Amino acid sequence: MTTQFRNLIFEGGGVKGVAYIGAMQILENRGVLQDIRRVGGCSAGAINALIFALGYTVREQKEILQATDFNQFMDNSWGVIRDIRRLARDFGWNKGDFFSSWIGDLIHRRLGNRRATFKDLQKAKLPDLYVIGTNLSTGFAEVFSAERHPDMELATAVRISMSIPLFFAAVRHGDRQDVYVDGGVQLNYPIKLFDRERYIDLAKDPGAVRRTGYYNKENARFQLDRPGHSPYVYNRQTLGLRLDSREEIGLFRYDEPLKGKPIKSFTDYARQLFGALMNAQEKIHLHGDDWQRTIYIDTLDVGTTDFNLSDATKQALIEQGINGTENYFEWFDNPLEKPVNRVES
């Protein structure tokens, strides 16, 4: 069984995150989950990361997500005037209150306090949690964790991370009341989150470190400005999970060409332009070797905000999570392959 992994990363993807349940089933069967020390994610990935960090079993996670009516997340006021006022005041059509209550209940069940903080999670000796949010006031992504935000409520961090711009009301947070939205605006797939030496036990797992040219160049500059800080390394103990269409998986994993989509109207143009910008944002921080530590899951063309998921579609997504994870380990464990992220014993 594969037991080299210590860190899990979940990409954002709205309701498509249901597919992670299938992936988690395989990771559990392979003995991977028992060795996970840190978990991070964005948006739907942050929700899955939190549920895992709270200690819910994979079976419990499946029961939770299958029993959830995602339509209830769309908690607008059923009054256009009030919704328009919220859009102008809070920058979102839906309040996000139902989600906050839902996630608060899950936190309370495990930690006894729906307002539990990152520090409380750490005291419970559960896996460390890292949540990505976008601070629109500064224009940069932020990582919420016990390292820098010990007193931040877990529910607030995840509520920020899932706040799809304009779809959900933004969150004002901190002394300055900065405006925060979905972490996916800046960093939807934070696969490099644990690429620092400080996240590796060098005495016990020296093989987990992989030196790369791009990080060596970055460290040369970084160490001049901040000597003594933990250098960047490619962390072989990190495993990521992505939610992509079959065509995108073919491009990223196998370098297959994409089929073009017809652009016959301004709406087509705007949709494709927005998609191209989002694709560039998602890939700009990645390197060619990151796919080797990534499980790709086919999302069956389900949309991020397709909250009206049928039970059949939920099950189909779960099965895709199973298939994608099995395919990954079939490749990873093949002695004829040479994954750069494999720790050789």
Task: Outline where the language-model segments fall.
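Patatin-like phospholipase
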Residues: 1-40, 50-345
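Gly/Ala-rich beta-loop-alpha elbow adjacent to hydrolase catalytic centers
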Residues: 41, 45
